[in-house]
Amino acid sequence: MREIVHIQAGQCGNQIGAKFWEVISDEHGIDPSGNYVGDSDLQLERISVYYNEASSHKYVPRAILVDLEPGTMDSVRSGAFGHLFRPDNFIFGQSGAGNNWAKGHYTEGAELVDSVLDVVRKECENCDCLQGFQLTHSLGGGTGSGMGTLLISKVREEYPDRIMNTFSVVPSPKVSDTVVEPYNATLSIHQLVENTDETYCIDNEALYDICFRTLKLATPTYGDLNHLVSATMSGVTTSLRFPGQLNADLRKLAVNMVPFPRLHFFMPGFAPLTARGSQQYRALTVPELTQQMFDAKNMMAACDPRHGRYLTVATVFRGRMSMKEVDEQMLAIQSKNSSYFVEWIPNNVKVAVCDIPPRGLKMSSTFIGNSTAIQELFKRISEQFTAMFRRKAFLHWYTGEGMDEMEFTEAESNMNDLVSEYQQYQDATAEEEGEMYEDDDEESEAQGPK
């Protein structure tokens, strides 16, 4: 079966990772000690994608937990599903990265990385036919961003033909832990552009707004934010974990979603978003789900899709519903809002339907959009980065770990290039294709709309 190896790095990565395993274990009928207690064959049909069946008929997650300090991992271990994980797969240092990307990427993280790769190798040898890796991490701290991107490039070196997929939590000034987040995020994005195949941008700012505006929570906690993340991650991975009509594996998803290799940053969304207690009073209809799912307020990245255009979209509907109705609704959305979909990729919206809804809901839908509006997120980080970098504020923490200012300049310009690439395809139309070749220089010709 096509297995996926899951890696979680740093405090944020371990917290959303642990929540992800709680949610999907529940969906697959696996109790905290790894025994199957479910009631449907569908739960077991593709269980081997994320779980390894041990000799004692216990199911063990194909998960590797990494951090540069023991704190978060201790709380995962003592949490509800802490005994599910393989004890050898907890790998941690003692020193911490101190929210410093350079420590995670070059000094502290580099010392720990070989022992992580040993465990990665062992997990991959347990697989019949590995399809790829998924990493959960944040871009604002030191370990998830610095060591996370180091792991990506090391794993990529060793498994160059496997898909690399990340769930990356992007920092926001509204929910800020550290003042150097823009530095860490820019240095990380510089790596993600080159080394991953698919990156889901999960934006704390958007999560906060959802909790505050839609769920009416006065003081959202990280627990509330992670609850949204785990719902989204569960939805995004549905077609990998359950048999469905559009049977996606990571590679098929990439083929459908990524028109140009650098533009692989997705905006996830989820519906229904209702406060936790108020769901049961009325069932949602397919039109309502479709409407909600395309709404800017439901996006997990703080970008307004109406400010850009969709290159590609994938959606997953869960629950018992009519395929015909789903197709009709999706077509209706596209024809009503045709200006928001680029016309030079026909049929750029793909729909999967899975019969098993998430716990507590009759139906739900998950949205994955590759929209040019994601440039707003990169612009936001870039502006904050430039404000500090112009004054060389806090740079000594990074140069002290052996980094060079040059690396910052490169990361900054790579991110700005990414923004202008998104802009280029936002403006591109099917007609002007011929003209673009004549007046552009060779470089953009190589990347121009084919």
From Swiss-Prot:
5-glutamyl polyglutamate found at: 438
CDD domains in the record: beta_tubulin
Region entry Disordered, spans: 422-450
Motif range (MREI motif): 1-4
Residues engaged in binding GTP: 11, 69, 138, 142-144, 204, 226
Pfam families cross-referenced by the UniProt entry: Tubulin, Tubulin_C
PTM annotation, UniProt: Some glutamate residues at the C-terminus are polyglycylated, resulting in polyglycine chains on the gamma-carboxyl group. Glycylation is mainly limited to tubulin incorporated into axonemes (cilia and flagella) whereas glutamylation is prevalent in neuronal cells, centrioles, axonemes, and the mitotic spindle. Both modifications can coexist on the same protein on adjacent residues, and lowering polyglycylation levels increases polyglutamylation, and reciprocally. Cilia and flagella glycylation is required for their stability and maintenance. Flagella glycylation controls sperm motility.
InterPro entries xrefs: Beta-tubulin_BS (IPR013838), Beta_tubulin (IPR002453), Tub_FtsZ_C (IPR008280), Tubulin (IPR000217), Tubulin/FtsZ-like_C (IPR037103), Tubulin/FtsZ_2-layer-sand-dom (IPR018316), Tubulin/FtsZ_GTPase_sf (IPR036525), Tubulin_C (IPR023123)
Keyword line: Cell projection, Cytoplasm, Cytoskeleton, GTP-binding, Isopeptide bond, Magnesium, Metal-binding, Microtubule, Nucleotide-binding, Phosphoprotein
Names of the cofactor(s): Mg(2+)
Binding-site list for Mg(2+): 69
Gene Ontology process terms (BP): axon guidance; dorsal root ganglion development; microtubule cytoskeleton organization; netrin-activated signaling pathway
GO cellular component: axon; cell periphery; cytoplasm; dendrite; filopodium; growth cone; intercellular bridge; lamellipodium
Modified residues (Phosphoserine): 172, 444
Compositional bias per record (Acidic residues), positions renumbered to this chain: 429-450
Places the protein is found: Cytoplasm, Cytoskeleton; Cell projection, Growth cone; Cell projection, Lamellipodium; Cell projection, Filopodium
Subunit and partners: Heterodimer of alpha- and beta-tubulin. A typical microtubule is a hollow water-filled tube with an outer diameter of 25 nm and an inner diameter of 15 nM. Alpha-beta heterodimers associate head-to-tail to form protofilaments running lengthwise along the microtubule wall with the beta-tubulin subunit facing the microtubule plus end conferring a structural polarity. Microtubules usually have 13 protofilaments but different protofilament numbers can be found in some organisms and specialized cells.
The protein's role, per its UniProt record: Tubulin is the major constituent of microtubules, protein filaments consisting of alpha- and beta-tubulin heterodimers. Microtubules grow by the addition of GTP-tubulin dimers to the microtubule end, where a stabilizing cap forms. Below the cap, alpha-beta tubulin heterodimers are in GDP-bound state, owing to GTPase activity of alpha-tubulin. TUBB3 plays a critical role in proper axon guidance and maintenance.
Similarity comment: Belongs to the tubulin family.
Domain notes: The highly acidic C-terminal region may bind cations such as calcium. The MREI motif is common among all beta-tubulin isoforms and may be critical for tubulin autoregulation.
Name of the featured protein: Tubulin beta-3 chain
Native organism: Mus musculus
Primary gene name: Tubb3
